[in-house]
Amino acid sequence: MSKIIPNSLIYFIYGFSFLGFSQNSSPIYLNPNASVENRVNDLMDRMTLEEKVYQMNQFVGLDHMRQAEKDLTEEELHSNDSQGFYKGLFSDDVAEMTRRGEIGSFLHVLTAEESNLLQELAAQSRLKIPLLIGIDAIHGNALVSGTTVYPSPITLASTWTDSFLEVIGTQTAKEMRATGSHWTFTPNIDVLRDPRWGRVGETFGEDHFLVGNLGAAMIRGLQQEDFTGTDKVIACAKHMIAGGEPINGLNAAPMDVSLRTLREVHLKPYKQAIDAGVYSIMAAHNELNGIPCHMNTWLMTDLFRNKWNFEGFFVSDWMDIERIDDLHNVASNLKEASLFAVRAGMDMHMHGPKFPEAIIALVEEGVLPLERVNEACEKILTAKFKLGLFENRKVDLNAIKDKIFTSEHQKVALEAAQKGIVLLKNQGLLPLKTTKTKKRILVTGPNANNQTILGDWHSAQPNENVITILEGLKKVGNQKGYEVDFFDSGENIRKINDNAISKAAQMASDFDYVVVVVGDNAMRYRWKDKTAGENMGRAALDLPGKQLALVKAIKATGTPVIIVLVNHRPISEPWLNDQIPAILEAWGPGSFGGQAVAQIIFGDVNPSGKLPLTVARDVGQLRMIYNHKPSAYFHKYALNKSTPLYPFGYGLSYTNFEYSKPKLSKFVLNSDEIVSVSVSVTNTGNYDGDEVVQMYIRDKVSSVTRPVKELKGYQRIFLKKGETKKVDFKINKETLAFYDINMEYCIEPGEFKIMTGSSSDDNDLQSIILEVEKRIEVDD
């Protein structure tokens, strides 16, 4: 019969053992003046096998568990994956495990108070090792209430501005550390190849060059060199690999891609992330060519760690080590699945019990080398020492308000929204001019007056911290002489009814303009309303529900209509482009999205966003990407157009830009030389504005087929009306390199078409020829 030891006795035993330990010697690992390497080695020498393995294991937060225990039935608890419930294990049990030092990391810890409590529990363990607390701070620390919610990643990608990502990363890190988190599961550097996938909004789009640059910038901002200090965090590149190309558009579906496609597309952003110093990488839910990514030795060990010198640690995605057994069926039980994962290079398990006992048994049986556990534990401990957690495990609750949602952070969030919103169409309707005679605007649509503008990966934020589109239009519109009214057509996109549509149309007849805010819903805390976001793949790309019927009814009144899209995957609705005079793609514009939209509609801000993906006319056109192969459209669709609705890199302005033909500093590239490409851009319109100048290349003849164009450079510039600026791009051997017929990375001799312009559309580009005379070998 077992006896329960009172907590007071546990505290006494732990306290006495540590007191005696510290009296005998001053441990090096507790000395902040010792080097990180020496502290790690000293601590490792003192740890048992069990304690090392515990550092490799993660649990969800206690409050998260308690909410599940409170809200769900027992049957739901055992079946609801998203709640992270552990069968037979409750929040009080997890708290006690933390006190015993049996947990190394937590996620879903959403308050500083809980973070401090967990760290206090961990401080009572034998070695007092602090916890590494991770969170999905995808675009700001938005799962924590009161923080700055920056535009969603797809909106940030639409700025085509690396510096925004770096600044936002730095600011996000400060808000994370202020609220008790140290590790963010971002950036998502999946290269989007199928927009049916629900997670489009958390990616940087379809081009590996743009994705890689923006991801590396975010990593630099979050980690700020080597993440040493108390205002920096660990970044996590995810999802390794090819998660953006599921065979059926659904999250976690198999990925079946060639080695060439892996090398040319999906792996490139990871190489950039590793070069940027990323310290953690998350494996993908999916299998890759028959092998679950969580047990892929070639990816984790052979390529990333041994060839590319990745120095950080790998973490599993949500319960995916278990899925090696119970979903992929390539292991007979969790113990075998754990062996396959850790032996392949996996360092941390997300999340829950049973993994530690499996790893401990495997080591004791001699099946898994102790060195593999030591390697994983050392990397995790290194992170904790560099982050300063041994000296600063808790946060100052009184200091939080001065570190989150600051005026500086708000300014950046607004500017990113202003520059990430894309003007898709404008037949002279926008901007709406200041009027002396009162004009009336009706605002309606399911996304007009709620927090859908915050995108995915956010919790409900204080209303005073969010400017909805209705609120923005009212504030700016009133200043311009407009009366702005609202009709609530219903917030649930799935349930817009005919009665609401009829009433909206009746009201529209009495107004001068109607702004209809449609799209989809990615708010994860309103699961039954969602139409986009994680695990929300769709078989169509049209406006879900009766939103198009709402727009058509209003358009039929004859009142001019402005469409604002708030969405987290591209919307394929050719009717809108054919019939509506003005369309704004706002994506998820963040805390100040409503203000940014209003400033663009009324002309205080000139739109300058560019699409980081291709928008197809219909789901039947998929896969539709700008960098397709030459034979992709050799034949055409029988009854439909073969062109996109909007091309990659596209975005309008209230002004016009005229491009010169590109010029080269020399016409032949030799091995280690750099060739400059210059183009002059003139603002020929009536407004000052930003333009994103783009450079593409095409290898005219090659030993294997190459894309019809590849993005290789971009620059955002500001031009006053009438002003001309020269933009320079650099071309070196890395710019032109590819994998030849023998999968050797090189440049083959021949001609390269260098293109510059305002989008990837051929009509927007001008070109010049660069020659390479001899084969050039390039390191990959």
Question: Can you annotate each of these PLM segments?
Answer:
Residues M1-S26:
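Bacterial Sec-dependent N-terminal signal peptides
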Residues G20-A737, P749-T756, S760-D762:
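Glycoside hydrolase catalytic-domain context in secreted enzymes
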Residues D740-N742:
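Flexible, membrane-facing loop/turn or short amphipathic-helix motifs
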Residues Y745-I747:
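Surface-exposed, short loops/turns at beta-strand junctions within beta-sandwich domains
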Residues N763-D780:
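Short beta-strand elements
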